[in-house]
Curated annotation (Swiss-Prot):
SMART domains: RHOD (SM00450). SUPFAM superfamilies: Rhodanese/Cell cycle control phosphatase, SirA-like. It comes from Bacillus subtilis (strain 168). This is Putative sulfur carrier protein YrkF. Residues 101-185 form the Rhodanese domain. The active site is at C15. Belongs to the sulfur carrier protein TusA family. It holds the Pfam family TusA. It comes from the Bacteria.
Length: 185
């Protein structure tokens, strides 16, 4: 069992709230201290792991206790960055106009499989956030790629991961599928 400096209750919250609360709480920690996050959202494991990696914090792991996931993150040192290099964004409205008029868009949906199966934009590539680092090579790093999730948080983390891997034209769709009114499958 890991020891934490601070415990954060994010039980019952859906994406992006566990990340939002974690980001705020990390500011209260000193470098090297550990934050324990209690969550019930199954997607929180991949979300927190990717967020920690993209901001210079250390993801230590997750312990499950029934429905509760106990995530552990160690605050990074002076080189950690909450907002490392900006990622270009497109509004959902502007993105929908592109989808409606252009059949050749490259769209990556990084939501969990359950979310994707409920409804997704026709023709998207689906790679859950937790698999983006390993599977990004399935995409062409020189293509313009629009990345979408539920709210814009996970897609931003995926874009950061892909940018570090050499992708040059990744664009985060904000706010994401929660407000999507276009065609779905």
């Amino acid at each position: 069992m890991m020891k934490a400096t601070i415990v954060l209750d994010a039980k019952g919250l859906a994406c992006p709230m566990p990340i939002v609360k974690t980001k705020k709480r990390m500011k209260d920690l000193k470098a090297g201290e550990v934050l324990e996050i209690h969550a019930t959202d199954k997607g929180s494991t991949a979300d927190l792991e990717a967020w920690a990696k993209s901001t210079g914090h250390e993801y230590l792991g997750t312990e499950a206790e029934g429905e509760i996931l106990r995530h552990f993150l160690r605050k990074g040192g002076e080189h950690s960055s909450e907002n490392a290099s900006s990622i270009p964004e497109i509004s959902l409205e502007a993105f929908k106009q592109k989808v409606d008029s252009d059949e050749s868009l490259n769209i990556l949906d990084v939501r969990e499989i359950e979310e994707y199966e409920k409804a997704h934009i026709p023709g998207v590539v689906h790679i859950p956030l937790g698999e983006v680092e390993k599977r990004a090579n399935e995409l062409n790093e020189n293509d313009e790629i629009y990345i979408i999730c539920h709210s814009g948080r996970r897609s931003e983390m995926a874009a950061r991961t892909m940018k570090k891997q050499g992708f040059k034209k990744v664009i985060n769709v904000v706010p994401g599928m929660r407000d999507w009114t276009g065609k779905t499958e």
